[in-house]
Every structure is written in structure tokens, then in C-alpha cells.
């Protein structure tokens, strides 16, 4: 039932109902931020990545067969590990010079 409501809200957002986004954001923001924080171990980065996740999810259609919850966590995980990898590359480059 919850996943049906999330998809309904997401589809309403795509149809122009901005309040639907606010409901989804309020429902998932803290959960996603906590999830990302456990990966990146930095509160400010987790907050920034969480914002990026919501922007990405709301600008790109969810793939057929995915629930909103699955998709947002998938994007969050990807963005968090991308951040870690980017920092790792920067560190490696700085150490070379």
C-alpha cells in the first residue's frame, strides 16, 4: 500500500502537483540522509548528496517496475559512492604532485 501511495504522489508531481513532491521529500529526506551519512561519514556531504538525490529523482522518470523507495535508495547509494570515489581520485592526484 505504501509503495502505491509513493508512486501515486510521484506521478502527481510529474503532472504538476508540487505539493506531492513536498510529501515525498518530508517522508524520505531524513532516512536518505542517514543512509548516505553511513556511507560517506560526513554530515555536510550527506546533506548535499541528499539534496542532489532528490533533484535527480524528481528530474528523471523512475524506471518501469521500480518502486519509489527502491529507486531513491538506489540513486542515493550511487551518489554516495560516486562522492567517495571522486575524493579518492583527488587524493591520489594530489599525492602524485
Regions found by a protein language model. Name each.
Residues 14, 52-68, 87:
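Sigma70-family region 2
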Residues 52, 95-97:
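Short linear capping/connector segments at secondary-structure termini
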Residues 24, 28, 32, 53, ...:
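Residue-level preference for hydrophobic side chains embedded in well-ordered alpha helices
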Residues 9, 20-21, 49, 68, ...:
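Hydrophobic side chains within well-formed alpha-helices
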Residues 63, 74-95:
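Arg/Lys-rich amphipathic alpha helix in sigma70-family domain 2
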Residues 14-23, 33-52:
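Short, charged helix-capping/linker segments at alpha-helix termini
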Residues 1-30:
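N-terminal module of bacterial RNA polymerase sigma factors
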